[in-house]
Swiss-Prot record:
DNA ligase that catalyzes the formation of phosphodiester linkages between 5'-phosphoryl and 3'-hydroxyl groups in double-stranded DNA using NAD as a coenzyme and as the energy source for the reaction. It is essential for DNA replication and repair of damaged DNA. Its EC number is 6.5.1.2. GO terms for molecular function: DNA binding; DNA ligase (NAD+) activity; metal ion binding. Residues 604-686 form the BRCT domain. It comes from Haemophilus ducreyi (strain 35000HP / ATCC 700724). NAD(+) binds at D42, A43, E44, Y45, D46, S91, L92, E124, R147, E184, K303, K327. PANTHER family: CHROMOSOME TRANSMISSION FIDELITY FACTOR 18, DNA LIGASE. This is DNA ligase. One of its GO terms (biological process) is DNA repair. Keywords: DNA damage, DNA repair, DNA replication, Ligase, Magnesium, Manganese, Metal-binding, NAD, Zinc. Pfam families: BRCT (PF00533), DNA_ligase_aden (PF01653), DNA_ligase_OB (PF03120), DNA_ligase_ZBD (PF03119), HHH_2 (PF12826), HHH_5 (PF14520), Nlig-Ia (PF22745). Signal peptide: none annotated. It comes from the Bacteria.
Amino acid sequence: MPLFSQFELSNNITPTQLEALRDQLREYEYHYHVLNNPLVPDAEYDRLINQLKNIEQQYPELITPDSPTQRVGAKPLAGFAQVAHEMPMLSLDNAFSETDLDNFLRRIENYLSLDANQLTFCCEPKLDGLAVSILYIDGVLQLAATRGDGTTGENITANVRTIRNIPLKLKMANPPHRLEIRGEIFMPLKGFNALNQRALAKGEKSFANPRNAAAGSLRQLDPQITRQRPLMLNAYGIGVYESNYQRLPTSHYARLEWLKSIGIPVNAEIRLARGYPQLLAFYADIQAKRADLGYDIDGTVLKVDDITIQETLGFISRSPRWAIAYKFPAQEEMTILKDVEFQVGRTGAITPVAKLEPTLVAGVTVSNATLHNGDEIERLGVAIGDTVIIRRAGDVIPQIIGIVADRRPANAKKIVFPTACPVCHSAVIRIAGEAVARCTGGLFCPAQRKEALKHFVSRKAMNIDGVGEKLIEQLMARELIHTPADLFKLDPLSLMRLERMGEKSAQNALNSIEKAKHTTLARFLFSLGIRDVGETTALNLANHFGSLENIRTANVEQLKEVQDVGEVVANRLVCFWQEQHNVAVVEELIAQGVHWDNIVQLEIADNPLKDKNVVLTGTLTQFSRDQARKLLQQLGCKVSSAVSTKTDFLIAGEKAGTKLTKAEQLGIRILDEHAFADLIKQLEYE
């Protein structure tokens, strides 16, 4: 198949060349929409479709009725009955830059003969899911269909009825006779990750991304399979509407608010904006929140809010004039896999790291990506020399999510997972039920020892400022440190012999080490690097037991009483304290002066927070996050990092995001910062 990513406009373009480009696009569309198995990143498809548009604009006599630019989507799958849409489900035009957005506004101005900056827009995140139509007749869900090719979709009613956040009956008296909801069905990241973990544990194929997972789940012929998948709907508009009781609002935003009031889920990030600067501000705000939303988005959707103006603007062949998708920089790109290196982590985990031909992804040059583990290498079928698809989302480490199979070179080289540690040459084993293979060398392995020391000094552990990764590596290379306790035995002369370490730098490092001696029990526990004991678990252990001695002597059953501690973590803790080397290091740290304040709980009558599970979210102005957490601990609370059905209170500061939304959905009691501060004052007064 020819590669058209470098297609250039010229005066000798032939119909044969154009048809080859169209065929390539059709092949990509078929794999994306029908097989749910994309061959190339969205960015590559976007580049090719835009090239085709440009060519057809320059040479309109070459446009054909079946060109990919002249239709919306893909054909329905043969396994589902077809549904004709009364109102076409069209796609949106894309904007990829501020210039594109400005051109969109100029087109509106020219069409309406008015200043587009005077228009109000309804702004929404662009969810990366599957567009659907859901029809309610007299308030009861009767029919659901995919978008398909825009005029004909697939009947997925049985599957949609299994999605928990879609009401089977509208929450209203006198419902409209016919109400068609248009929306996006997607899979939240937490559910997607859990689904893939279950699949890998069973030896089944995992999904490349949440969109593929949502599409595959929605197109199951057995609704019982769909029922087990964590799908959700966010409505973004209304299609057919017939009612003898009420007229719809003439504001798109107000229509979405009305949908929410009758039980239809609507995205929590939807806002109104007026004019170019506010549209850019919304785009920037959503882009900044992207990594924390809990679901995949690939841009924003900007719609003229006034329905009357929408109707005046109307449509072009395949999209409305009154809306545009302003997309984020591509998070997926193609590049060449040059080699694979195997790294050893703090707990001995062997991680394959892909060495890539450097390429720009989401504004950052990427030359390394994770391949996770041996199962992932096998699932991808990837080889050295392959053209691979890499994905970078937010601050997540770039990963390879697929290969372009038809571009594999003849000299591609198979990736062989090591059976011996690449650092200490100890045996590599994989425990049954785990995806990760591990070096058995323990602290004999220099790589594990180095990573354990880096973890010990890190910000969320002992927070030793000025002692970073490079200094740890130098200290180990000179054999000045072997265990965390050795850090507290360093002297100025030893440090001054190191590279870029003068007298002042050495003293600053020693001052930081001295300062770190006063810590908290939770930080100290976390710094020890006990496997599966993260920051939150360490905090829960400290709050529950109150002292290190109590934690050291607790048995498995006592440990399991702690929130978030199950059988596996409890056994890891018991095993850690049974290892005399670990006990010796801890005792040496305490002998070197590491200490912490006792955890004191305030004894207050009628304390509504005692023994409650509390989650903090958003930005607090009257307290730092650590101050708020400490106050809650003193009041006898269990402070968690995630909202769940076990959460009793959510304390929400400014710019609270998905945790607030989830708490509202679960009916959890919510305190804003002022209410929290008032409660603290009241309890302190009592």
